[in-house]
Amino acid sequence: MDKLRRELAPISQEAWNEIDAMARETLKASLSGRKIVDVHGPRGFDYAGVPLGRLSVPKQQPSGEVRYGLHQVLPLVETRVDFSLDIWELDNIGRGARDPDLDALVEACRKIAAFEEKAVFDGFKAGSFIGLHEYAKDRKVGAVLNSDAFLDAVAEGQAMMRRDGVDAPANLVVSVDIWKFLGKSVPGGTLRSIVERQIGGRVVYSEAVKDAMLVSARGGDAELTVGQDLAIGYNGHDTTKVSLYLLESFAFRVITPQA
């Protein structure tokens, strides 16, 4: 038996397939951070920390010839969201239902995705994660919803990165308002397509940013390390409901703040 205990749930394989497909679809739409940073893993459920390649050497040490240092690691945070589904409704999948009520699953996916997104963009103090916004707060370029002014702001952002030694393609992470604005048609295509040609990367929609953020696409500048990737496990059940949970473990760090 594995740690997820899925084989104990009163759920058919057909229903599990539907549950997993819905979870993948929801998470893919909700996890923007994974589209713009390096993702390492999954390393496994027992992977607990990312080695940082440094020693912390205490100043106060016992007298004698032997001294010691402690390896620095970035611990992974493990997140979990519980939810319940109706057993009869899951059985309906086997009866041919094509619109099963999986709203509780969708909500759980959005909650756990929001936690990861917040950790990537805003940081997670308890885990010593510093988010992308923290590094970008002193390197802002004003942008308004005007085609020429917006393209100029993107160009200024690129110039700022080059002055900091980051001469590489970039991705632009944008809020919902800017995402809609970039969909407008202009000579040469949509404004989004013009921006993508300009930056050499992608425009990525995210609910975790308020305006827009330019992030290097060369790789090696920020990383999300995954231990246990997002997975659904079984808690228990009664005659009407099956209790499940969504689980993951991860750590995030920025390696090159200028990017």
Language model regions located:
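Alpha-helical scaffold segments that mediate packing/assembly in large oligomeric complexes
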Residues: S84-I87, D91-E156
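Long, hydrophobic, amphipathic alpha-helical segments used as structural scaffolds
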Residues: R34, D38, E116-G123, R162-G165
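A generic local secondary-structure boundary/capping motif
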Residues: Q72, M160-R163, G233-Y234
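Sequence/fold signature of self-assembling virion shell proteins
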Residues: D2, H40, S185-A259
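N-terminal "assembly arms/tails" that initiate or stabilize quaternary assembly
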Residues: M1-L70, G227-D229, G233-S243
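Structural beta-strand/beta-sheet cores of well-ordered domains, especially the beta-sheet scaffolds
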Residues: V81, A168-A170, T240-V242
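Long, hydrophobic/aromatic-enriched structural stretches that serve as scaffold segments
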Residues: V50-D99
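Extended, solvent-exposed, turn-rich assembly/linker loops in the middle of proteins
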Residues: L132-V195
